From Swiss-Prot:
Pfam families cross-referenced by the UniProt entry: TACO1_YebC_N, Transcrip_reg
GO BP terms in the entry: regulation of DNA-templated transcription
Coiled-coil boundaries: none
Cell compartments where the protein resides: Cytoplasm
Lineage: Bacteria, Pseudomonadati, Pseudomonadota, Betaproteobacteria, Nitrosomonadales
Annotated protein name in UniProt: Probable transcriptional regulatory protein Nmul_A2722
GO cellular component terms given for this protein: cytosol
Species assigned in the record: Nitrosospira multiformis (strain ATCC 25196 / NCIMB 11849 / C 71)
GO molecular function, one term: DNA binding
Length: 240
């Protein structure tokens, strides 16, 4: 893993997310709605919903918006019925890309995703073409200077799978998806606040890009992110 660039990449990702706050609200509302539809409207018994609600509040989403989305999902209010779809493909220099979507029109979505891949030098693959290059897991990243020994003790006790100390001083905690909330809460209770905390698709191996390849890959990722139906974009690319 490229430890030296981990922290810079996370800070870049956070800045990009902050710049797209309006779109983040839309995505979170979709996620809350679908999570409530699939697992019920009680966050205490629905880990996926709990995670989505926590993220919404971290983004300062008004409580009434959150509650309305839960009611739409659980059937108490009328709403759009979204379908979850994952597309797989390749970007620049063979970097793998996963694109998670929620849509009410599959034909529109696949056309938009294919157009972005084609326009910016990638290509849309078939189901299963790159999914095996990622691991579904919880990920928490802590700033350089964090007490590694204490964090490791708390994280492992709470059920974390792995702790990675990066070259830049940041510390990464990996969990099984279903253990993520418990580990996050245990660490917060012990005074550890993650700079990034999410259930994600983590690359098994990373593809480091530099120069023109970095610029081209970023354009592809930005194009995919800008599609209304896209919820998340994951890639093995590390952009210098």
């Amino acid at each position: 893993m490229a430890g030296h660039s981990k922290w810079a990449n996370i800070k870049h990702k956070k800045a990009a997310q902050d710049a797209k706050r309006g779109k983040i609200f839309t995505r979170l509302i979709k996620e809350i709605t679908v999570a409530a539809r699939l697992g019920g409207g009680d966050p205490n018994s629905n880990p996926r919903l709990r995670l989505a609600v926590d993220k919404a509040y971290e983004q300062n989403m008004p409580k009434e918006n959150v509650e309305r989305a839960i009611k739409r999902g659980s059937g108490d209010l009328e709403g759009v019925n979204y379908e979850e779809i994952r597309y797989e493909g390749y970007g620049i220099a063979g970097a793998a890309v996963l694109v998670d979507c929620m849509t009410d029109n599959r034909v529109r979505t696949v056309a938009d995703v294919r157009h972005a891949f084609t326009k910016y030098g990638g290509n849309l693959g078939t189901d299963g073409s790159v999914g095996f290059l990622f691991k579904h897991c919880g990920q928490l990243l802590f700033a350089p200077g964090t007490d590694e020994d204490k964090l490791m003790e708390v994280a492992l006790e709470a059920g974390a799978e792995d702790i990675i100390a990066h070259d830049d001083g940041s510390i990464e905690v990996i969990t099984a998806p279903y253990e993520f909330v418990a580990v996050k809460e245990a660490l917060e209770k012990a005074g550890f606040k993650a700079e990034l905390a999410e259930v994600t698709m983590k690359p098994v191996n990373e593809t480091e890009l530099t120069g023109d390849d970095s610029v081209k890959m970023q354009k592809l990722l930005d194009a995919l992110e800008s599609i209304d139906d896209v919820q998340e974009v994951y890639t093995t690319a590390v952009i210098d």
